[in-house]
Amino acid sequence: MILFVGFLLMEIVMPQISRTALVPYSAEQMYQLVNDVQSYPQFLPGCTGSRILESTPGQMTAAVDVSKAGISKTFTTRNQLTSNQSILMSLVDGPFKKLIGGWKFTPLSQDACRIEFHLDFEFTNKLIELAFGRVFKELAANMVQAFTVRAKEVYSAR
């Protein structure tokens, strides 16, 4: 009985990913990199395509294609944009029952900021989670590092 209860508890806990980094770039610079969805395939590991479906000053709907080890999926999010401060994502379409999260950019000085990335997600079913779960978790867990490396490439060249 205890094993069964433990199994049920494991089933209802959604995977969460949280990453934080202190970077020698402004909040504005980091916000611009993260909000530049169309450039994702150039530097995000596993990202094979991205497109903006709708865009207004405070909101963007974008689709991102991810592929790894022969497994490909597309997901679409609606992003609430607070310029140079935060990007809040919510699921529109994709292999998830739930996907919410976002980015927060906190200035530390003119040339440094703290970036925070948080994601809560749950796949639509166990089969999709078995096929794609590890790939997606790995991609999501490496997002902050990928953007930090990208910032160095883009802003150190100036």
Curated annotation (Swiss-Prot):
SUPFAM superfamilies associated with the record: Bet v1-like (SSF55961)
Q: Superkingdom of the source?
A: Bacteria
Q: Which InterPro entries match?
A: COQ10-like, COQ10_START, START-like_dom_sf
Tell me the segments the record calls region Required for resistance of nitrosative stress but not persistence or toxic effects: 70-158
A UniProt-annotated Pfam family: Polyketide_cyc
Question: What's this protein's family per the entry?
Answer: Belongs to the ribosome association toxin RatA family.
Free-text function comment from the UniProt entry: Toxic component of a type II toxin-antitoxin (TA) system. Binds to 50S ribosomal subunits, preventing them from associating with 30S subunits to form 70S ribosomes. In this strain of E.coli low levels of PasT complement operon disruption, however high levels are toxic; their effects are abrogated by high level expression of cognate antitoxin PasI.
Report further notes.
This strain of E.coli has only 6 recognizable intact TA systems, whereas E.coli MG1655 strain K12 has at least 16. This may explain in part the differences between the 2 strains.
Name of this chain's protein: Persistence and stress-resistance toxin PasT
Please report the organism this UniProt entry assigns to the protein: Escherichia coli O6:H1 (strain CFT073 / ATCC 700928 / UPEC)
